[in-house]
């Protein structure tokens, strides 16, 4: 029960996963097993160097960006960067879900029958299992969590698959809990992707052959294995050391110099890792701590043991049968924030002894746990400012906007003129809110908040309300101070990152159940207006404010002083999208048709031939009639 509580899987599920993983090696692509109401998909492990580093990939670690339109959740919202993964592993997934196999149809069948799905694999088959799980989450689970049961991914000695953003995205979506990775103490495969391709490529094929259990056994004195192990662990040390220096904010001069002339591996652990020794299992959820353990668990103070570790790094890759069989009898420890590194036979301190963790290793793990603790503390600090944000936004909605509307020019134009005391108060609140949201964005960009923060519905909603209410004031201030004349268009040179971040968070949240991305949705709407070829329209709209409703006023300011014929396409685009923005709450229709508003004044100058046929015409008439009564 304790094991299942910590990992999300029980011993029986692990045993079946292992048996299926072994059986998958006799297949071309995958093995499907049904046990009770659960369907197991196990993937074959390939020991070909081409399946570790894609042949045409010239990057130092065989990496490639995941395509956002295929994996829209696998990205950083704060930094607007897509996940990096190993290209060879990704290609294996693409073959798997393509027409050459029955895998896609088999998964669809399991989903239709509401069966739980487990993806599993040993060695490099585990890499496929990890990406197949991500594909399932993006294709089925995110779109209908009630119809698609929660998956599980169980791997044995799998290599690392993706970068920090891969780890972060899984954490943001609360998907990390679905991944459980078993690692024997010295197994080299979970460390291989931390080495540079140029470091290991000459001996890689030979070592992969030794990792294949169907081939001839290795000897303790095999010098090629020793050289390979040494090179992998040298690079692993550099990655782990640089990572811990970043955690404690203390860059060592040697590491700074080293990383300046060659890149370090981007790959990072994801999910839960279960490290195994002869006596116990150690469960770890902290990715930073796992990275440190991947290096330090392969060290030893015993001279005799140290000399045979290269041999053990291959032998342990073949030791998962024994691990699985002993799950029920081994001691169990959990390394986390709430488990101090104490002594005693069943303590985490004793577990670290079994893993050969030195004093330096424990300091590095402590730094990783402290960094996690600090991220939690940072979130608590941000949470204390929620009431301040709500109070300031409420004043804008309940006091400032109604008073401005009573003057028939709206809060956008009133703020631009800034003739009233309330305009000054609004500016103070605007500046205060900017400080809070800039602080939040700074923490997000630096990874100093828990991964789940970006996915918090409460903060997404609050940031959206902030963007919709306050960005028009920033635009008003920008144009009121004539910054557009000195600096250029607001959308090109003036829009603060805090609004872009809030926009991305909102769009991601509402679109992820559809599997679509904001850019594609926008162009689908624009193409529906039938204004011309998309290529031509893209050139016209490249610096426009039509991609976001809270930028409505920025687009109006850019268009209002130009001849109608010159901006006809941009205006029709704005006009065509406005109905949806009003419906979604992005634009307040009470504001735009007030007699003194910038938009209404510009609207009145447009040709009657356009206004009569415009989609806004009936709405304008209705608003006028409502005010008249």
UniProtKB/Swiss-Prot annotation:
A GO cellular component annotation in the UniProt record: nucleus
Protein name in the entry: Protein EDS1B
Keywords: Cytoplasm, Hydrolase, Nucleus, Plant defense
Function: Acts as a second functional copy of EDS1. Can mediate HRT-mediated resistance to turnip crinkle virus.
Keyword Cytoplasm annotated: yes
Lineage: Eukaryota, Viridiplantae, Streptophyta, Embryophyta, Tracheophyta
Further details from the record: Ecotypes cv. Landsberg erecta and cv. Di-17 express a probably non-functional truncated protein comprising of only the first 162 amino acids. This protein is not expressed in cv. Wassilewskija.
Keyword Nucleus: yes
Annotated active site: 123, 187, 317
InterPro entries: AB_hydrolase_fold, EDS1-like, EDS1_EP, Fungal_lipase-type
Gene Ontology molecular-function annotations: hydrolase activity
UniProt-listed GO biological process terms: lipid metabolic process; plant-type hypersensitive response; systemic acquired resistance, salicylic acid mediated signaling pathway
Induction: Up-regulated by salicylic acid or upon turnip crinkle virus infection.
Subunit and interaction comment: Interacts (via N-terminus) with PAD4 and SAG101. Part of a nuclear complex made of EDS1, PAD4 and SAG101, that can be redirected to the cytoplasm in the presence of an extranuclear form of EDS1. Does not interact with itself or with EDS1.
One Pfam assignment: EDS1_EP
Domain of life: Eukaryota
Phenotype of the disrupted gene, per the record: No effect on RPS4-mediated resistance against avrRps4 bacteria, due to the redundancy with EDS1.
Subcellular location: Nucleus; Cytoplasm
